Each structure stands twice: as C-alpha cells, then as structure tokens.
Swiss-Prot record:
Residues 1-31 form the signal peptide. Predicted to be exported by the Tat system. The position of the signal peptide cleavage has not been experimentally proven. NAD(+) binds at residues 64-65, 86, 135-138, 155-156, 184, 244. This is Glycosyl hydrolase family 109 protein 1. Its cofactor is NAD(+). Glycosidase.
Amino acid sequence: MHNIHRRHFLKAAGAVTAGLVTANIALNANASSVAPKPRVGKSVIGLIAPKMELVRVGFIGVGERGFSHVEQFCHLEGVELKAICDTHQAVIDRAVEHIVKQNRPKPAVYTGNDLSYRELLNRDDIDIVIISTPWEWHAPMAIDTMESGKHAFVEVPLALTVEECWQLVDTAERTQKNCMMMENVNYGREELMVLNMVRQGVFGELLHGEAAYIHELRWQMKEIDHKTGSWRTYWHTKRNGNLYPTHGLGPISQYMNINRGDRFDYLTSMSSPALGRALYAKREFPADHERNQLKYINGDMSTSLIKTVKGRTIMVQHDTTTPRPYSRHNLIQGTNGVFAGFPNRIAVEHGGFGKSYHEWDMDMQKWYDKYDHPLWQRIGKEAEINGGHGGMDFVMLWRMVYCLRNGEALDQDVYDGAAWSVVNILSEQSLNNRSNSVNFPDFTRGAWEHATPLGIVGA
C-alpha cells in the first residue's frame, strides 16, 4: 500500500475501524491488564481449512513488499490473482503490468482512499488476502479480512498493542479463519535445516536461544514521500523498545516449540541511548529539514531476555541504526551442542564428524548433505531462481499454498504471530519500569500445554 504519511501516522489507525484499539493508544498498557477473556469460538491451533482446488488471492498493498509477493505468486501453481488494492496509482500500475506480462488475467483494482480495501473484501471470489501495508494497518485489515470470511496473511509485525493481539485471536477463533503472520525467515534454508537438526536431537535438550534483527537502515530516512522510510522512521520517535522482533525470534520459537509444549513466560528489556539517527540526520540533511526536527527516542540497541515456562532463555536484540554487518544471530544451544548463524557454524559434543566441540565447524556442506530440510530439497532450486530474500519468500508462499490446497494446517498461526509480535510492546513496558519483568499473555488460553509440536514439515 502507498506508504501512509506522517499525518496518517499521527492520526493512527484507530480511526479506521470503530472499536479497534490501534497504534497510538494503549502503548503503555500493562500486559496483565488485558487478561484472557472467555473464548468466544474454539481454538485454531491446528486449524485446517477446507481444501481449495485453486487459491484465489487478493492483495492489500502492492508497494515495495507487496509487489514482491505479487511477483512470487505469479510463479506458483494453483493460484489466481483476483484483485489488488493500494492508494498509490503508480504501484498499482506496476503490479497490473507485471501480472499481465506473466500471462495471467488482469486483476480487479481498488483504490481511491484508505478504506478502499473494504471493497476488495466484499468480493466473494477471494479465499485469502495478503496484507503488506504500514504496521499500524496490519491488525485492523486482518480483522476486517477474517470478518469478511477470508483467511488473513499479514506482514510482520502482526499487531502493535496487547489489545490488538487479543482482538486478532478472538476474531480468528470466532470466525475459524487463519490469521498467519508471514514470518519468512522461518523458511530460510539454514533455519529449516536447524529445525530438522533440532527435531532429530542433534543438539540435545534445548536450553538457550539468541535472536536479532541487526540491519543498518538509516538510509531509509531519505525516503520522504514514498517507501518504507516515509512512515517507519517515525516509529523511532514514538517508542523505545524492540520495534521489530519477529525475524530472529520466529525460528528460535519454532525450535523450542513455543505455543506447542512451552510458551513465553516473562520478559525484561533494556535499551542503549538513542544517538545514531540524530547524528545521521545532522550529517545527511539540512539543519532546517524535518528529519532534524524529530526527537528520536528508540535506543540504538534494544536487548530483551525472555524466560519460558520450561525455564529456557532467549535473548532478542534490535538495532537498525548503528554501522555494523547484518545479523539475526540464530543461535540455539542444547545439552549436546550449538548452532550459530552469521556466519553459520556448529559445535557438538557427539555426532560432529570428528570435530572437537572446542572449535567451531564452519564447513557446512556435510551438514547440509545430512540435514538439509525436505522443503529445500524439493523446491530449493525453484526458490533460488525466483529469489525473495535468498529464496525464503518463495518457500514460505509455496508452503502456504500447499497447505491450503491439500487440507493441512499452516506452520504458523495467530497465537504465534501474537506471541512473537507482543515483544514490541512488552519490551517498552519493561524499559519504562526500570527493566523489571513483564508477563506474557497466554494467547492460547492454556492450549499450548497439549498442542502437537511442529514437526519436520514437508510436502
């Protein structure tokens, strides 16, 4: 979707749908103040939608990220691209042109204002909706999608407040519709190989994980009227916490069976000073430029520690400001050894091809030969050709479509999206209370204790 400018950001999406609590309210509400409400439907853990011969897709938002999804869907079998919506005509024209060039029927187009997406939702020939819009629109649009009888697939993060998380859970349970936050990193080749290794016991009993989103993005501040920086920059002036936790946390959560035998219990968080963006603005923009009038409050480095009910620990970091190489950490430690990413390396006590666990084994090929994930073995070449963050985007969308067409449960559900996203809010709450711990809501309402762990998913 056309990146909503500052006036929309400051208005907040609460004006979009009456009764929805959104980005600019309840930012500091304690998680415990939103206790589990009585379930109005039934749990959607393991929800299986009726098989779809064809998956008919609508897209809300076809800008930078949304257009990438359009490109990937054009390479998938068993899908129809029925309609697109955006408030920016140029990105609509680009998406339509691309779809037609791929010898697919021209999609219907909805535009004109911020609520035009509701016209798309009124169609009866759409099964799923891909939502790729600025963050404050994710929850309202996903709720409206499920209320319209369609499955919602939402870009990260899923929600921006604890109340939004509960509204998404309640709506999914009442409508019995999927609401999947599309955490693409869970489908990376390394992440899925490690999931395979974890399930086969290579690392022993899991103890500790480390996750991060360390990605220098100051350059986005130069995106003034369009693109991600035109709205994402302002979040650094509104919140102080982990703004974007899910890329690193998603894979660690699946390794540890979070919401499927374990769950997040509580969190504590700290942030460094917020210096880098003001320094960058001073260096890169005129003194009277709007970027130099902003007060950047989000600490350059946010570090949170999560304790699970089973006693495991997870470190989660966020830094999109300082000059340093990209990393998601992706470290998982067990009683028999450890995997760490960026760069990939392994050390195990038993089963390490003769390598001592006192030294990192950085020769990954033999590990791929033995533990490469079935999904990557099957469609890895297609994924590499079609791209999308090294192929993980293609694998994610392929797997989504496969599950919908074959009557299988999705790999991520609304509870996962809520638990991973709520770190954003809880990290801020902890920081504002001298880093004291904050409890995680149990969005599953106790169902996590008996949920079947995610297996080595395949096809």
